A protein has these predicted regions:
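A conserved active-site cap/scaffold subdomain adjacent to cofactor or substrate pockets
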Residues: 161-170, 175
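Histidine/acidic residue-rich metal-binding segments in metalloenzymes
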Residues: 47-57, 79-131, 144-158, 184-200
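Structural preference for beta-strand elements that scaffold enzyme active sites
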Residues: 16, 34-38, 61-62, 106-108, ...
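Active-site environment of divalent metal-dependent phosphoester hydrolases
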Residues: 23-24, 44-45, 69-74, 114-120, ...
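A metal-dependent hydrolase metal-coordination microenvironment
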Residues: 1-49, 68-73, 77-89, 93-96, ...
């Protein structure tokens, strides 16, 4: 949080921490780089949740209760291939309180890295759409980190969202980390997610934080190449705009609100 605040101060207006969808739209229209403060793994927040309110005041608007390990809030899925996300117990009492507090504050709860029992608990408790910011289809790549068709159906019912993860271990049908892979695997995941969720509920989740990604993408500068591949695959400009930003704006608009 402090580093993002420093980036905003040091950028001379080129970077902005966004806490509303109007902020995001303004940045898109004027060319400002926008950032959403997200916490992956809620270890910095204790079970009393006092720190959650401090982070929210600093701009936190998206939170994953766990990374792929246990916390005081729940259990993350270990990285296994092949494997299923049914890997342990659900949310703790502190985890359930965290979901409710996020709902009251208007903080999006991220289901990526959460095991199946925890996913089910969030689905029962939350008042917001179900969102997995960087996960793929288990039916295509049977990794513990990917979402089963049953989970996708629950996300669809909530009018939620899945962001496609570019990490090769979650894209390749063999679960390997190698970046040398055809575009076909990316297309299979996107086609499956759109078939299960509808084109209004899928976007890009990237995971550009050190994960091995397809060599055709490489980093954020490879996104235009991905768009060209999707055009050749038959995706029209309207669908590309949804995948790139419109669907994220829409689900955040349904999730973010002033504290209540």
């Amino acid at each position: 949080a402090g580093h993002m605040a420093w980036m905003e101060r040091a950028s001379a207006g080129a970077f902005r921490i966004c806490t509303t969808v109007d902020d995001l739209r303004a940045c898109l229209s004027n060319g400002t780089i926008s950032g959403i403060m997200h916490m992956e793994g809620a270890e910095p927040i204790g079970p009393d949740l006092d720190a959650l309110h401090l982070y929210h005041a600093m701009g936190l608007r998206s939170l994953g209760p766990v990374w792929s390990r246990p916390t005081v809030f729940g259990h993350g899925v270990p990285f296994r291939f092949p494997g299923a996300p049914d890997t342990g117990a659900g949310l703790t009492q502190a985890g359930k309180a965290l979901v409710k507090a996020c709902n009251r504050l208007g903080v999006m709860v991220d289901l990526s890295h959460l095991n199946e029992a925890g996913f089910n608990d969030v689905a029962r408790l939350t008042e917001a759409p179900l969102v997995a910011t960087h996960s793929n289809a288990h039916a295509v790549t049977p990794s513990t980190r990917n979402l089963t068709d049953r989970q996708l159906a629950m996300i669809a019912e909530s009018k939620g969202m899945v962001g496609l993860n570019f990490a090769t271990v979650f894209l390749r049908p063999d679960g390997r980390q190698s970046p040398d892979m055809p575009w076909d695997a990316v297309l299979r995941h996107l086609d499956h997610l759109i078939a299960k969720l509808g084109e209004d509920h899928v976007g890009f989740g990237s995971d550009f934080d050190g994960a091995t990604v397809p060599q055709g993408i490489g980093d954020v500068t490879g996104l235009p190449a991905l768009q060209d591949v999707l055009r050749a695959h038959g995706y029209d400009e309207g669908l590309l705009a949804k995948l790139c930003h419109r669907n994220w704006f829409a689900v955040l608009d349904r999730t973010w609100h002033p504290p209540r």
